[in-house]
Amino acid sequence: MDLHSRRIISHKVGKFMDIKLVMDTLKMVIYKREDTTNLIIHTDRGSQYMSKEYRKFCAEKGISISYSRKGNPYDNACIESFHATLKKEYVHNEKFENLESLRTGMYEYMEIWYNNSRIHSKIGFLSPNEYEESHKERKQKNCLKIV
């Protein structure tokens, strides 16, 4: 989740929450965002995020790592809140036949509905994509003023 816009940048669904799943998700973030300048990834202290492979990859890409304090989920309140919303609005209301139907459902919820339609008070009652678009427009106008 981009904390500025509340946009879900990348997500993966797998049978196991292992280093491969984490690395695949992180690589997709880099692919979608392209520029990792000033990128900070904040996570809990799960073994996947504490691994040498993860830390080395982030260092090579110039990504700063931030960890929640041990036993303190409030340090990552935005994503904890998102997970609660995801469960309440979607997961608990659906029946998934298999892993593929779960993947499809998660894609539809996050990419099609959440990023495009779910409004947030913290970003002016806009959806994450609307907020990012308006931010880009303001940035472009500011650049034009400078030139």
Which residues are covered by each model-predicted region?
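RNase H-like polynucleotidyl transferase catalytic core
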Residues: 41-45, 60-78, 94-97
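Acidic/histidine-rich, metal-coordinating catalytic segments
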Residues: 35-50, 69, 126-129
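Active-site beta-loop-alpha junctions of metal-dependent nucleic acid enzymes
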Residues: 12-34
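C-terminal domain-tail junction helix/linker
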Residues: 59-63, 85-147
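Hydrophobic (often cysteine-bearing) scaffold residues that line and stabilize catalytic clefts
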Residues: 14, 18, 22, 50, ...
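Electropositive, glycine- and tryptophan-enriched low-complexity nucleic-acid-binding patches
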Residues: 2-12
